[in-house]
Amino acid sequence: MKLLALSLASLASAATITRRADFCGQWDTATAGNFIVYNNLWGQDNADSGSQCTGVDSANGNSVSWHTTWSWSGGSSSVKSYANAAYQFTATQLSSLSSIPSTWEWQYSTTDVVANVAYDLFTSSSIGGDSEYEIMIWLAALGGAGPISSTGSSIATVTLGGVTWNLYSGPNGSMQVYSFVASSTTESFSADLMDFINYLVENQGLSNSQYLTHVQAGTEPFTGSDATLTVSSYSVSVS
């Protein structure tokens, strides 16, 4: 759906990067520290009208600050984009991972939108293979935005990283999606994302032989106007 092929051939320099011009093309990107920041308007054809631009404010190694501004109307049940910061790392088997520490500080300019703010992780049974599992961690479900779900109801409630989450499950094409949705909007977040993976391994049958292939963080808008997500600080690492 929103997964983009990420080149791991060369990691970005850890040199500090300062603010640059916004980019507005459907598939425009910017390399920023150890991230690729995507505009990623993958669902724009579902809108009657709209546009979106994304920009990098600063970056240094495993930390990045960025923003995205959008207006979308029509297609109220469809996601229009997933502007995100995608961390660049070598795909690693879950059983070999020990920690994925992350912090995220963000703010939306308005709450009069239908959108989420969410991590998006993908796993595959082989390096370079098709994604089989999608793990979303929703820090916000604004304006009634909801996750993929087979039943429309959560399958569990769990507290991880000091936040209570409702867990949903359902298919996205050939992938199985697990979505942890925060019980209340969380604009300041600090946790080890490995805790979410371990929960799924221990309680939902996710195999630890899967490879973690992508770690992304961004926003999925459905509808709204003149909305800006500002990520004042975001960091993540995989080890």
From Swiss-Prot:
Keywords: Carbohydrate metabolism, Cell wall biogenesis/degradation, Glycoprotein, Glycosidase, Hydrolase, Polysaccharide degradation, Secreted, Signal
Activity versus pH, per record: Optimum pH is 6.5.
Catalysed transformations (reactions): xyloglucan + H2O = xyloglucan oligosaccharides
UniProt protein name: Xyloglucan-specific endo-beta-1,4-glucanase A
Origin: domain of life: Eukaryota
Gene Ontology molecular-function annotations: cellulase activity; hydrolase activity, acting on glycosyl bonds; xyloglucan-specific endo-beta-1,4-glucanase activity
Span of the signal peptide: 1-14
Protein's job: Catalyzes endohydrolysis of 1,4-beta-D-glucosidic linkages in xyloglucan with retention of the beta-configuration of the glycosyl residues. Specific for xyloglucan and does not hydrolyze other cell wall components. Active against tamarind xyloglucan.
Localization: Secreted
Assigned GO CC terms: extracellular region
Temperature-activity profile: Optimum temperature is 47 degrees Celsius.
Glycosylation sites: 172
Family that this chain belongs to: Belongs to the glycosyl hydrolase 12 (cellulase H) family.
PANTHER family registered for this protein in UniProt: BLR1656 PROTEIN (PTHR34002), XYLOGLUCAN-SPECIFIC ENDO-BETA-1,4-GLUCANASE A (PTHR34002:SF9)
